């Protein structure tokens, strides 16, 4: 396909805009995949609560979650200092061993490098949101008391 230079430039600009709009729609709403290389540094981030799902692709209980974790990521998009993460224990086995994962799915909250809670409640967005928000509030209060 041979395009005139002006038409080619317009096509490239249009394509770039489509990509930017798609990326903007996803920014802040995505669940962050944590790996052996990134897990420790991320969960140690100052003043940041990490709510992490540990799963493996072959687990029927993980599959039954459907889009729950992604939906939580979207709902928590505007939440200050709360990040939603996930670890594939099939790929990042050392991470899952380090934090004592023995069943799937497992949901844990980390604050400044330490595990502060494990979620065992209902599997719906509202319950997950309330849980991690409460844990973030507790972490903030504990930090103020330590100061």
Swiss-Prot record:
Gene Ontology biological process terms from the UniProt entry: protein folding
Keyword Lipid biosynthesis attributed: no
UniProt entry tagged with the keyword Membrane: no
Pfam families for the chain: Thioredoxin (PF00085)
Intrachain disulfide bonds: 59-62
Lowers pKa of C-terminal Cys of active site (site feature) positions: 123
UniProt domain Thioredoxin: residue ranges: 30-137
MF GO annotations: protein disulfide isomerase activity
Family according to the record: Belongs to the protein disulfide isomerase family.
Function comment: Acts as a protein-folding catalyst that interacts with nascent polypeptides to catalyze the formation, isomerization, and reduction or oxidation of disulfide bonds. May play a role in storage protein biogenesis.
PANTHER family: PROTEIN DISULFIDE-ISOMERASE C17H9.14C-RELATED, THIOREDOXIN DOMAIN-CONTAINING PROTEIN 5
Protein name in UniProt: Protein disulfide isomerase-like 5-1
Organism for this UniProt entry: Oryza sativa subsp. japonica
